[in-house]
UniProtKB/Swiss-Prot annotation:
InterPro entries: Mpl, Mur-like_cat_sf, Mur_ligase_C, Mur_ligase_C_dom_sf, Mur_ligase_cen, Mur_ligase_N, MurCDEF_pg_biosynth. Pathway: Cell wall biogenesis; peptidoglycan recycling. It comes from Escherichia coli (strain K12). NCBIfam families: mpl (TIGR01081). It holds the Pfam family Mur_ligase_M. Its EC number is 6.3.2.45. The keyword Metal-binding does not apply. Coiled coil: none annotated. This is UDP-N-acetylmuramate--L-alanyl-gamma-D-glutamyl-meso-2,6-diaminoheptandioate ligase. Belongs to the MurCDEF family. Mpl subfamily. Disruption phenotype: Enzyme ligase activity totally absent. No effect on growth. Keywords: ATP-binding, Cell cycle, Cell division, Cell shape, Cell wall biogenesis/degradation, Ligase, Magnesium, Nucleotide-binding, Peptidoglycan synthesis, Secreted.
Length: 457
């Protein structure tokens, strides 16, 4: 079959393209911005990429067009597909029909930690000989790709609540039909497509509804929003994580780089890994519980996590200059900012200085939905620098004023980088947080710090 993918350079759609190639289909695709690393990955798989959406790319006519969720009516290719009656479907629908239908699906859903937890579950199964397939929203550190067909019945998927396509406004995850479901947490997010928390809970309950009776749902017992969702009705086995639940994690070190796994009060495993932070410990516990449902002993799962490498942009060390370390993180919601800063604080100790540099870039952030929670979430940083994005209906100066520590802002990335370099001293740790490229600020900081070191000699 010849498949053409509109919006191929996103992580999810690029992953589907790789799976389609592994299934033996001829695959082409287009995107408004064809750029590495995804373009390189796809071209290596023999997938032809086209820049832009000129309708001529649909000649000769493909057998099927997979339409990404960023595509809208008015797009020349979308209009041509509809006009010529070319068969089309959304990415999640294709995944269900061509990949997941006969598989044991382990899905990871929730507001935070999906990519990390899905990566952990995949690595546990891989290390324990299960050879799973996977589709993950970032490239897990232990693998070279974000999607793989696998060689067994088991398939791990990052289950996103975002919508499928302009013609299917349900959450992607309703197509995945999981047998093992991790619900990490639930908060209001994606304010561009959801009106309120109830609207998201409704979609999550659609997901809960399609887990089989002998399937299993693993969720944290202290999450009020999930508790309300589960109270709408659940027909599957449940395992709870947390103090009153079946599973607990007990820190053995302050930074959570070593921890015990407890099941029904008994120690069943111990994790020693390169990750830090209680949020990662929570993610790891979820992955261990999910792996047990498919047959992996918790002790084996815990051992496997010892060699787990996280996806890029998860408290990733980007470099060091003038004695200052620069980290990068994908955090783009107050809860994630709080967890990432807590993890870094645990890693570097209570007296080291942490400088937080934040770009409010997600749609929810830009709309100002969670702006009042930003200053408290930044509390563990010693100094804060904020970028003021253009064309948003609120001012980051409000957040700077609400911060208890010194806080500064600028509307220009270069100016902001200069301000950070000026204040940073040897021994400091800079944490850059954004779900985008942040104007290449990481390298600007490292270059600026190196120049500062030269000037001081």
């Amino acid at each position: 079959m010849r498949i053409h993918i509109l919006g191929i350079c996103g992580t999810f759609m690029g992953g589907l393209a790789m799976l389609a190639r592994q299934l033996g289909h001829e695959v082409t695709g287009s995107d408004a911005n064809v750029y590495p690393p995804m373009s390189t990955l796809l071209e290596k798989q023999g997938i032809e990429l086209i820049q832009g959406y000129d309708a001529s790319q649909l000649e000769p006519q493909p057998d099927l067009v997979i339409i990404g969720n960023a595509m809208t009516r008015g797009n020349p290719c979308v209009e041509a597909v509809l006009e010529k009656n070319i068969p089309y479907m959304s990415g999640p629908q294709w995944l269900h029909d061509f990949v997941l239908r006969d598989r044991w699906v382990l899905a990871v859903a929730g507001t935070h930690g999906k990519t990390t937890t899905a990566g952990m579950a995949t690595w546990i199964l891989e290390q324990c000989g299960y050879k799973p397939g996977f589709v993950i929203g970032g490239v897990p550190g232990n693998f070279e790709v974000s999607a793989h067909l696998g060689e067994s019945d088991f398939f791990v998927i990052e289950a996103d609540e975002y919508d499928c396509a302009f013609f299917d406004k349900r959450s992607k995850f309703v197509h995945y039909c999981p047998r093992t479901l991790i619900l990490n947490n639930l908060e209001f997010d994606h304010a561009d497509i959801f009106d309120d928390l109830k609207a998201i809970q409704k979609q999550f309950h659609h997901l809960v509804r399609i887990v089989p009776g002998q399937g299993r749902i693993i969720w944290p017992e202290n999450d009020i929003n999930l508790k309300q969702t589960m109270a709408m009705g659940c027909w599957s086995e449940q395992e709870l994580v947390g103090e009153q639940g079946h599973w607990q994690a007990k820190k053995l070190t302050t930074d959570a780089s070593e921890w015990e796994v407890l099941l029904d009060g008994e120690k069943v495993g111990e994790v020693k890994w390169s990750l830090v932070g209680e949020h990662n410990m929570h993610n790891g516990l979820m992955a261990i519980a999910a792996a047990r449902h498919v047959g992996v002993a918790p002790a084996d799962a815990a051992n496997a996590l010892g060699s787990f490498i996280n996806a890029r942009r998860r408290l990733e060390l980007r470099g060091e200059a003038n004695g200052v370390t620069v980290y990068d993180d994908f955090a783009h919601h107050p809860t994630a900012i709080l967890a990432t800063l807590a993890a870094l604080r645990g890693k570097v100790g209570g007296t080291a200085r942490i400088i937080a540099v934040l770009e409010p870039r997600s749609n929810t952030m830009k709309m100002g939905i969670c702006k009042d929670d930003l200053a408290p979430s930044l509390g563990r940083a010693d100094e804060v620098f904020l970028l003021q994005p253009a064309h948003i209906p609120w001012q980051v100066a409000e957040v700077a004023e609400a911060c208890v520590q010194p806080a500064h802002w600028s509307g220009d990335v270069d100016t902001l980088a200069d301000m950070v370099v000026k204040t940073a001293q040897p021994g400091d740790h800079i944490l850059v947080m954004s779900n985008g490229g942040f104007g290449g600020i990481h390298q600007k900081l490292l270059d600026g710090l190196a120049k500062k070191a030269e000037a001081a000699q």
